[in-house]
Structures are given as structure tokens and as C-alpha cells.
Amino acid sequence: MKFAIETINLHVYYGRNHVLRGINLQIPQRGIFAIMGPSGCGKSTLLRTFNRLIELNQDARVEGEVRIFGKNIYSEDVDPIEVRKKVGMVFQYPNPFPHLTIYENVAIGVKLNKLVKSQKELDERVRWALKKAALWEEVKDRLNDYPGNLSGGQRQRLVIARVLAMKPDILLMDEPTANIDPVGTAKIEELLLELKTDYTIVLVTHSPAQAARIADYVAFLYLGKLIEVGPTRKVFENPEHELTEKYVTGALG
């Protein structure tokens, strides 16, 4: 079986700080895979290795392999820009470009990478991405407005639309609902459940409850080590490790 993402003996250092320690992980194609663990355990660092965004930190050093659909993305012949086209990223804080309209926010990556040949194709791509992100009906009459008037949840769905417009294979989500109200969170969780049939979604979450609600598989990290990984129900109801049990029951934060 060819996994969407596979790490082999993955180590990450920030200077002398050994942040990830020998991570061996296999993430299946399609579905939602949640990475959970207490603050500072290495969740976001691990996520950033999956599209080489980690390399934007000059102090970071990566050892081992990260394979995307079987190809080691840290090979010398791999362009990180090309990796990021296929492995999209959504961050914790909704970050639409404030100086661009709603339409332009979705269109910008498509235009810069020349993914369409005409204005008509661009219009269709923007509409498709906004529909895919469950935002079209809310913004279709104000595409030329700026995103400042959108709610936090709407801004995050706009960012998701911007990523989807690039037609990636994998979506990386770094605590995408951490700064969004419960109503906005519920809409984004519902959206992810719809998207998982077409995409591999890797979700970093600070909330075991969120992982239990929407993830098909979960991985538990602690102090830079992969403690346990498996189907969500099994990990929550019958964990193999005491640390995992403490975390999912709230005894370890």
C-alpha cells in the first residue's frame, strides 16, 4: 500500500534542541488523521516537515525521510515549492490577505502559478473552491469586498478555499479552530468531514475531544516521541500505553 505520508526515522532539531525523536508514521490516503498531544510536544513541527515548511526556520535541521505518495520530499531533486503546491497548509490564525478582495484571496495562488488559461477558467476555479469550502452562498454577492468584515470562521473557510483552489492532494491543518468560536468551529469540522472523501487531511489539534469527533486515525505525541497511533476509536477506548490513557482522559495536559 502506498501511503499519503510516511516518515522514516524522522528527527528534527532546532539548533541543539532535539524536537522530534525517531518518528516512524504512516498516514493512509484520504480521511482525517489527527496529531494530538500536550503543548510543546512537537505536533506543529511534525506537520511542517510534511511540506518542508520547516526549512523556513534557519535553525531547523531534518534527518530521516518524509515520503509523500512514496517519494522522499527531502531528496536533492525535489523542489519544495512544488511540494507545497500539492501539500496545502492552513494555520491556526485565519490569515486571508487583508488588502485583497474575497475573490482575489482565492484566485491569487492560481494566478501566480498559472494554473488556468483564461478569466473564465479562473472565475470557475474561484467559484468551485468557495463552494468546496462551504462559503459560496455566504459571499457570492460580495466577492469584491475585503475579508475584514467576515467572521473568524468565515475567514478560515476563505483560507481553506484559497488552498483548495490550488488542487492539492493533501491538506495540513495546524489547529485550524483554536481561535474560532464554537459555531465557526462546528462549521469547519463539518466541512472537514465532507472534504475527507477527496483529500488526505492531517489535523494538529490541542483538543482530544475534537480528534475523537472527526478523526479516522490519531497519533499521540509526547516530548517529541510518537507514543501511540491507530484508529481513533481504538486509541480512545482501548489505548495501549498509560500515557495515552492519561492524555485522552484529561489527566495529562
UniProtKB/Swiss-Prot annotation:
<dbReference type="InterPro" id="IPR027417">
    <property type="entry name" value="P-loop_NTPase"/>
</dbReference>
<keyword id="KW-0067">ATP-binding</keyword>
<dbReference type="GO" id="GO:0005524">
    <property type="term" value="F:ATP binding"/>
</dbReference>
<comment type="subunit">
    <text>The complex is composed of two ATP-binding proteins (PstB), two transmembrane proteins (PstC and PstA) and a solute-binding protein (PstS).</text>
</comment>
<comment type="function">
    <text>Part of the ABC transporter complex PstSACB involved in phosphate import. Responsible for energy coupling to the transport system.</text>
</comment>
<dbReference type="GO" id="GO:0005886">
    <property type="term" value="C:plasma membrane"/>
</dbReference>
<comment type="similarity">
    <text>Belongs to the ABC transporter superfamily. Phosphate importer (TC 3.A.1.7) family.</text>
</comment>
<feature type="domain" description="ABC transporter">
    <location>
        <begin position="5"/>
        <end position="248"/>
    </location>
</feature>
<dbReference type="GO" id="GO:0015415">
    <property type="term" value="F:ATPase-coupled phosphate ion transmembrane transporter activity"/>
</dbReference>
<keyword id="KW-0472">Membrane</keyword>
<dbReference type="InterPro" id="IPR003439">
    <property type="entry name" value="ABC_transporter-like_ATP-bd"/>
</dbReference>
<dbReference type="GO" id="GO:0016887">
    <property type="term" value="F:ATP hydrolysis activity"/>
</dbReference>
<dbReference type="InterPro" id="IPR003593">
    <property type="entry name" value="AAA+_ATPase"/>
</dbReference>
<keyword id="KW-0592">Phosphate transport</keyword>
<dbReference type="InterPro" id="IPR005670">
    <property type="entry name" value="PstB-like"/>
</dbReference>
<dbReference type="Pfam" id="PF00005">
    <property type="entry name" value="ABC_tran"/>
</dbReference>
<feature type="binding site">
    <location>
        <begin position="37"/>
        <end position="44"/>
    </location>
    <ligand>
        <name>ATP</name>
    </ligand>
</feature>
<keyword id="KW-0813">Transport</keyword>
<dbReference type="GO" id="GO:0035435">
    <property type="term" value="P:phosphate ion transmembrane transport"/>
</dbReference>
<keyword id="KW-1003">Cell membrane</keyword>
<protein>
    <recommendedName>
        <fullName>Phosphate import ATP-binding protein PstB</fullName>
        <ecNumber>7.3.2.1</ecNumber>
    </recommendedName>
</protein>
<keyword id="KW-0547">Nucleotide-binding</keyword>
<dbReference type="InterPro" id="IPR017871">
    <property type="entry name" value="ABC_transporter-like_CS"/>
</dbReference>
<keyword id="KW-1278">Translocase</keyword>
